[in-house]
Regions:
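An N-terminal assembly and electron-transfer interface module characteristic of large anaerobic redox
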Residues: 1-447
Length: 447
């Protein structure tokens, strides 16, 4: 098991039975990637951009080379009910001369142009690796622009080398607080909630909102899927925050609790079990008896309606083996539960940004001998998928080529996908995709 693993990586790979080093100390996580390990993680800047990008009327100016802007251009498949300017990416396109002499003037001109041509009211300015090296003062530029135009121009100091993708999440959360805080007036909307950490991929936010509306809960603000500057500025009025993507938004929930007294709970709307539990927990947290009764009725009806559908596909999937490699721990946990419902054994599971408590739950849910990895690289994924004879890999766009090269089925569960996988509707889409991929006749041609 350890032959092809870098010595520095051994503590980040365990089995559900024992630690890879044999000392039983558990998994090493929440650390910077090992140099030379070819991590699948993205950079700090990317972490910040993916959280802020779905704000529908925000403008994003990337201060750096054009490649940084291209890398994250329209990176999430987020849908909008309003403006779609967020799908644009603006860059200062720094060249060698600008790196030598500084790019502050270019950034100032870029902000001026975005305001003049587009009437921007909210601008995020990102510092990339090059800017971190040459020391352009983006904070001063943003302060001057804010005073000049009387709009929000918010600096996001996110050089890729300054930490992990998780650090980018925190920087994005701090930027969101700068949008919300000026509108805080101490008032509350009783029984209302904010949804944090859902990015409205393929309209998933609207699915979740639909469930909550059916049971009588008002959604105050969504952060950041289908959000706008105006809706974000009402976020401090909510009575409860629910956190879907814990990795990217728990920090924001904690800040809102500390500063404005808004409690939060973590939820997951992936799979029948987690969707039902989340709806019930939200209803109980709101504390209204009528809401709780409606939640119980909704979850029972939806779960029962899916049973015949699941029974149809389960015989084709029982006994198959799955590998999981996703961004956050909450998604991996939900996927394991979904596979358990279908009779599929999870033999390999890893995340890019999972926390110790996530891995503890993953270990409890996993069968004996399951390989658990933090911040895995392609070589490790290949080694353990072949060793465990996985039939399908659930991951993102970077893992797709690896699966196909190994002759393994693949399911895209990352933010590039074009169909909803959340909620009860998402269960149908997920099971159908798993069945189509894992039972495709093409695999018979590879034997």
């Amino acid at each position: 098991m350890t032959a092809d693993i870098l010595e520095e990586r051994k503590k980040s790979i365990i089995s559900s039975d024992f630690c890879c080093q044999g000392d039983g100390s558990g998994i090493s996580c929440e650390k910077e990637s090992v140099s030379g390990a070819v991590s699948q993680r993205a950079c700090v800047y990317c972490g910040a951009r993916v959280v802020l990008n779905p704000i529908t009327d925000a403008f994003h100016i990337i201060h750096g080379p054009i490649g940084c802007s291209s890398y994250t251009w329209d990176i999430r498949g987020s849908l909008t009910s309003g403006s779609d300017v967020f799908r644009n990416s603006f860059s200062t396109d720094l060249k060698e001369r600008d790196i030598i002499f500084g790019g502050t003037k270019i950034l100032e001109a870029a902000v001026d142009e975005v305001v003049a041509k587009h009437g921007a009211k909210l601008i995020f300015v990102y510092a990339t690796c090059i800017v971190g090296v040459i020391g352009d003062d983006i904070e001063a530029v943003c302060r001057a622009a804010t005073e000049k135009y009387k709009i929000l121009v918010i600096p996001v100091k996110a050089p890729g080398f300054s930490g992990t993708k998780s650090q980018g999440y925190k920087l994005a959360c701090d930027a969101i607080m700068k949008v919300i805080a000026p509108a805080y007036d101490g008032s509350k909307i009783p029984g209302s909630i904010n949804i944090l950490g859902d990015y409205n991929l393929s309209g998933e936010m609207w699915i979740i909102e639909g469930y909550l509306k059916k049971i009588g809960i008002k959604v105050n603000a969504t952060i950041t899927g289908d959000a706008s500057m105006q809706t974000l500025q009402t976020a401090s009025k909510a009575s409860l925050n629910i956190v879907q993507c814990a990795g990217s938004s728990t920090y924001l929930a904690k800040r809102m609790e500390e500063e404005w007294g808004i409690p939060f709970i973590k939820v997951s709307f992936f799979g029948v079990e987690d969707t039902s539990n989340s709806i019930l927990r939200v209803a109980q947290a709101v504390g209204n008896k009528e809401v709780i009764a409606k939640a119980e009725e909704l979850t029972q009806t939806e779960s029962a309606g899916l049973q015949s559908f699941l029974d149809k596909y389960k015989p084709r999937l029982v006994g198959k083996k799955a590998a999981i490699y996703v961004g956050g721990g909450f998604k991996a946990i939900s996927l394991i539960r979904q596979f358990n419902e279908l009779g599929i054994e999870t033999v390999v599971v890893g995340t890019q940004t999972g926390q110790k408590e996530d891995y503890d739950i993953i270990r409890q849910l996993s069968n004996s001998g399951t390989i658990i990895m933090d911040d895995a690289n392609p070589s490790e994924l290949e080694t353990f998928m072949k060793e465990k004879k996985a039939d399908i890999l659930v991951g993102g766009v970077k893992e797709r080529p690896l699966a196909y090269k190994l002759g393994i089925a693949f399911c895209d569960h990352n933010h590039e996908r074009k169909h909803a996988l959340a909620g009860y509707e998402g269960v149908r889409n997920f099971v159908e995709e798993i069945n189509l991929s894992i039972n495709s006749p093409v695999w018979d041609l590879l034997d």
